[in-house]
Structure formats: C-alpha cells, structure tokens
Amino acid sequence: MEEVLKLKIPASTANLGVGFDSIGMALDKYLHMSIRKIERANWEFLYYSSELEGLPKDENNYIYQTALNVARKYNVTLPSLQIEMRSDIPLARGLGSSASALVGALFIANYFGNIQLSKYELLQLATEIEGHPDNVAPTIYGGLIAGFYNPITKITDVARIEVPHVDIILTIPPYELRTEDSRRVLPDTFSHKGAVQNSAISNTMICALIQHKYKLAGKMMEQDGFHEPYRQHLIPEFNQVRKLSRQHDAYATVISGAGPTILTLCPKEKSGKLVRTLREKINNCASELVTINEIGVKDEVVYLKS
C-alpha cells in the first residue's frame, strides 16, 4: 500500500486595518498538496496550476528548504518525496501564500519525520520562522485569530475571535507586491502618542467585532495608522474600491496583508451587487466573494494500492 499525505491549506488575510502583524483570518482559497515517498535521490515537485508556474523544482524550493530545516532541528531524516501541488492562492498578493507554503512544509516534516508536533507546537515553530502570527495562526487553526509573538521568549499566544457575520470581497490586482517592498515604505518608529492612538483604535475594533458591531468595527479598521497610510499609494485601485464600497454600505475596505489585494467587509445583503459593481468599474482586477475558513489546515493520510 502506498501512503499519501494530503493537505488542504487555506489562504489568509492579515491586519484587518489596524491589527498590524497580529490579526488574521483564514479564507476559502487553498493550496492543495499530495505528498508521497519516492525511491529517488532528489525530491520531485509537480505543479498543476498557473499560480505555481515559475516556482523552483529543486533544492531552492521554499517548502523543501523549510521541511529539511525542521527535520534538522529535531534530528530526523526525511525520505525523498514527491509533492504534487495545486493552488488558487495568488502569489505575492497579500493572501498568505508564503504562510500556506510554510505550514505545508511543517506538516510534511512533522509527518514524514514522525516528529509528533502538536498544532500548538507547529504554531510556535511557524511564528518563530515567520516573525509574527497574523497569517500562520489562522492558516493552522482557521477563523479569526489575534496573536502576539514574543521575540525574547519565542512564545506565541493567540486568542480566537468569533467569526464575523459578514461577507468578504477580495479585489485582486493583476500585479504582485512583495512583502519586503511593501514593508520598505513603513516608518521605523512611531511616536508614543501615535502608538497609543493606534492601540486604542485596535482595542475598539476587537471589542466591536466581539459584540457584532460591524459598523463600529469597520470605522476603526479604516482609521489604521500603522501601515495603510504608507502603502495605499502602492495600490492605485485602492481609493476607488473604497469609494464604491462605501456607496454600497460596506463596513470597511482595507489592504489585505501587505497588498496589493483589497479586502472589503460588507453586509450579506449588499455583497452580490457590490462585487458585480467592482467587476464592472475596476475591470483590470479580479473581484470575488469568498467565505471565512473556520477549520484551518486539513490533513489526512490515504492508502493507495501500489
């Protein structure tokens, strides 16, 4: 019998405006992986979607490098593997494609190295590698997650927030915006006054989400001062998306992660008309309705006749 590990790993959106590097939500776009042992010297990567075209198929592959680094950390040896991949998560668009790949690599190392890491331990490891939990936490656990990574203790603490009863619209531009380029425009420091103000906005946003006060939550999301004022000029379509969304009574329009994808939260009864309007008025972008993934990464082992 041939043993195959199958992974279904969700996309994620980070920040929700003012929750910079600490709040994220899993979405129903996925990286699908099928992994099996092979009797060869080198790993084999097979890609079955356009989103993955151009990715390395050798030792420069990020999943390969990450899985081997984890194996070394726990003093185990991984067999040669064949990894089949299919994805509808666009790369470098602010939808957590790198976090999905990272989580996939951790699950591969954990299973084929028989390391026996719990989900909590996988989160700790993922956040230590990534530097913050905003994408990896919802990717692993699903839902809407707030978290903090302490770089001194190297411990990540997370709390789950009830998933908001709203519809999500993604407006995805045709161009990439790499995280390192998007971070380059951010200031190195904030004044104490500015930090206090943004902290107050973030606190209010979280409380409003918990109480299902989505208008208030959206108002807070759109008052972010941590990153959006510095990044909006990198996304020419942003202001028009926000303007159209407000005309359709959306709760908030924010940058998804480092961008350039634009995330809109809106009432369920308004979402269909809004997404059609966005498709018509901003036709160089792909606008679509998505739902919130509440379970995180799904892993299963299947056995096939050899």
UniProtKB/Swiss-Prot annotation:
SUPFAM superfamilies: GHMP Kinase, C-terminal domain (SSF55060), Ribosomal protein S5 domain 2-like (SSF54211)
Gene: thrB
Location within or outside the cell: Cytoplasm
Amino acids binding ATP: P90, L91, A92, R93, G94, L95, G96, S97, S98, A99, S100
HAMAP family in UniProt: Homoser_kinase
Enzyme class: transferase
Name of the protein in its database record: Homoserine kinase
GO MF terms, alphabetically ordered: ATP binding; homoserine kinase activity
Purpose of the protein: Catalyzes the ATP-dependent phosphorylation of L-homoserine to L-homoserine phosphate.
